[in-house]
Amino acid sequence: MTILNHTLGFPRVGLKRELKKAQESYWAGNSTQEELLNVGRELRARHWQQQQQAGVDLVPVGDFAWYDHVLTTSLLLGNVPERHQNADGSIDLDTLFRIGRGRAPTGTPAAAAEMTKWFNTNYHYMVPEFQQGQQFKLGWTQLLDEVDEALALGHKIKPVLLGPVTYLWLGKVKGEQFDRLSLLKDILPVYQQVLGELAKRGIEWVQIDEPALVLELPPEWLDAYQPAYQALQGQVKLLLTTYFDSIGHNLDTIRALPVQGLHVDVVAGQDDIAKLNAKLPQEWLLSLGVINGRNVWRADLSHWFERLQPLVNSRPLWLGSSCSLLHSPIDLSEETRLDAEVKSWFAFALQKCAELALLTQALNAPSEAKLAELAAYSAPIRARRASSRVHNPQVEQRLAAITAQDIERQQPYEARAAAQRKRFNLPAWPTTTIGSFPQTTEIRGLRLDFKQGRLDGKNYRTGISEHIKQAIAEQERLGLDVLVHGEAERNDMVEYFGEHLDGFVFTQNGWVQSYGSRCVKPPVIIGDISRPEAITVEWAKYAQSLTDKPVKGMLTGPVTILCWSFPREDVSRETIAKQIALALRDEVEDLEKAGIGIIQIDEPALREGLPLRRADWQAYLQWAVDAFKLNAAVAQNDTQIHTHMCYCEFNDIMDSIAALDADVITIETSRSDMELLESFEDFAYPNEIGPGVYDIHSPNVPSVEWIEALLRKAAQRIPAERLWVNPDCGLKTRGWPETRQALANMVLAAQRLREEQV
């Protein structure tokens, strides 16, 4: 039996982020819809061709999305929120963008769909909205149109469709509550219609994605798979596709389904391939995701050959990427600044396609020459294990020497709080901001000129110092109590620290999609992490010299740096997080020596890092909390440690939030009307809290009365003496005019509440 290979999906944005640029040009009114559609057609044709040329047997179609693939599925099913609907009920590209970006058909603002993380990745999807009695119909033929495009170009294809149970699982009920699973019977006819249309086009296999099968689903959701797939069988062959974790716990349900094949992620999952092979129906095709779609490391193809060879001829077999290559940059050959050794360790999406082809060829026709080719390809990643670029004995010794004492502050919170009150003598309702101030064109230009060599270090530092001086002066004029330096020197909260730590490298074009038109370029952690010199001390010390008020030192926490980077695969995530924590622990110590008495360690990704299955949560939370404490615990009693977190669900991890033992936590609460504080109230959270009093993602300026009312609500849940007053998040993306006005109103609201206490 000949083994075939395939990818589960390919990056959409284009090597030069062509899709992003075309989207934003269209949204700004600078280009026509036809011009945007042409860019999409060109990208799809190029990506299909590139995959085919790299040796992919079956290229995916339907993985392209104008904004997000879950949103595309919503439109396919005719699921458009009423506030975004065209008057005649039609669906077009503008409908899709309105849902993603927040507009009514009239052009007036209307709430965008909620956005949240796609499983445990850094990609975000638009959450489907469901209402009782809702009707579904085939409303958007993008998938069928793209299948026609690919067939016309002569490609061997495999359409990709998000499965019905996972689609419902990912959504939320709006309005009157009901069981959204009850809508399954209503969406299945649309799926049947789509599969019928694909059958008419001569399609043999359809990849139907059901990643919810890696989760610990409630019994009623697991039971829904059987009737769903009974309804979908018979028109085409279905490759039930899972990824991001193992499926062993749901295997009994899976193997009873009327499908013809199963794709399993054997990179992220711990499934035993031999046992899986033995337990599946003999006639099923087994697709093994052996090439990591979520990281940038070259595969050890010799290793995979040894693991897979016993399966050859045991059943129909395909090899694939572990998940969609959406999460990987496109082409390593474009990276001209990486040194040769490091570059030899990497593989981006196109190189991963070539890896699949090489491994498939070797398994189909093994020979000494082919095995030598696999060994030669795998040699750099094997040589890496002994590279001095990877291993730093001092870091490894320091990590091994960590004791329980290293992760605990000297005294409990009550004693520290007394020492801090004495040192800072802050008023009731102390006001502060989260860290960053508006990144003006001038600031971005200054950094770019320095990075590209048009500006020397001395003039760059002079320019940044001037912006810090302005930020301090603005805050003093506004009457804020605890100041920040404004972060003019920072392009990104993770990249900035990665650039100053050993163990990281950066790409030129390693862009991956975050959501819509937003792309990120994660750093790559290649080895043991250490801090060669102080990172933030110079700027914090300068800012503090300009004012008698306390200035916060600003650090990104170890878990967030880990989660927002491409990590090593040869050590555990815990090891990486603790290495970062040790490096930043030294930064905390140096900030203290420089006279900085308040230090903020941001951990917005703490909750994002949770494993997919709740059974694995406790182990993760233990080391994540320990990493934060290792970072912070070196601080003296009268040094106040702040942390900032911006997400909307604390209930299920409150024990861990409290265990961080930060003196002050600032959180995002304005959009929930302070309801998030309920978790802290119920838990009787003992330390100080700064609930965000206005939404920095909106240009709207909150009134004094609005902020005052929110603070009064907060004081009903948390004792006023433990409350801080601050925005929801950093102000990097805002302009100065609305920033000044919003902060002035915030300070005035705090002053009014203080006056009541006198």
Curated annotation (Swiss-Prot):
Residues at which L-methionine binds: I434, G435, S436, E487, D602
The keyword Nuclease appears for this protein: no
Keywords annotated in UniProt: Amino-acid biosynthesis, Metal-binding, Methionine biosynthesis, Methyltransferase, Repeat, Transferase, Zinc
Catalytic activities: 5-methyltetrahydropteroyltri-L-glutamate + L-homocysteine = tetrahydropteroyltri-L-glutamate + L-methionine
Note describing how the cofactor binds: Binds 1 zinc ion per subunit.
Gene Ontology terms describing biological process: methionine biosynthetic process; methylation
NCBIfam families named among the record's database cross-references: met_syn_B12ind, PRK05222.1
Protein name as annotated: 5-methyltetrahydropteroyltriglutamate--homocysteine methyltransferase
Gene: metE
